Regions:
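Auxiliary alpha/beta "docking" domains used to position bulky ligands
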Residues: 1-166
């Protein structure tokens, strides 16, 4: 999606918000070589442990078009899963366990995939474009794509951190 398609970008952002997404950005479906080099260093150091599939899918991970050669653009949506209250307040209650906020609700893979399917169907109907969706279960380095799209920064802990959403 280039400048000729600004109306589509605006539509994606508005439709994404209607589907419950907080943020939307668009970037090229390609990653700079430094991302592949970083993954290579990680794999060569053995940091992937017994997750052999990471090495087996290295090329697909670093080349988004390896899974779908027609891909030219990545549209990244973000959703804040934080609760309305401060989750740190629960730490004082010694009678109950505390788990990560992202794991407290329904499985986010299912929640987000359902929303994305709705959005993808509407985009395909509107434009005639082919659309594929991924919710961090495919060998796709979505966090570097999100950073490249301007949604935040990927930190040492590998999470994407955003100024607006943490």
């Amino acid at each position: 999606i280039d400048k000729r398609h600004n109306d589509i970008k605006d539509w994606l952002a508005a439709t994404g918000q209607a589907e419950g997404f907080d943020i939307c950005a668009v970037t090229a479906a390609e990653l700079p070589a430094i991302i592949g080099a970083g993954l290579d260093n990680y794999l060569q150091a053995g940091h992937h442990g017994d997750m052999g599939w990471m090495a087996e899918t290295r090329n697909r991970r670093t080349t988004p078009t390896a899974m779908w050669d027609a891909a030219r653009t990545a549209v990244i949506f973000g959703c804040n899963y934080g609760p309305d209250h401060d989750p740190m307040d629960n730490l004082a209650a010694k009678s109950s366990a505390n788990i990560s906020v992202y794991a407290r609700g329904r499985d986010y893979h299912n929640v987000l995939k359902g929303r994305l399917k709705q959005l993808a169907g509407r985009l395909a109907a509107r434009t005639g474009w082919q659309v594929k969706i991924f919710v961090d279960t495919a060998p796709l380095m979505e966090k570097p794509l999100a950073a490249q799209a301007g949604l935040g920064w990927q930190c040492k802990h590998t999470n994407l951190v955003s100024r607006g959403y943490g």
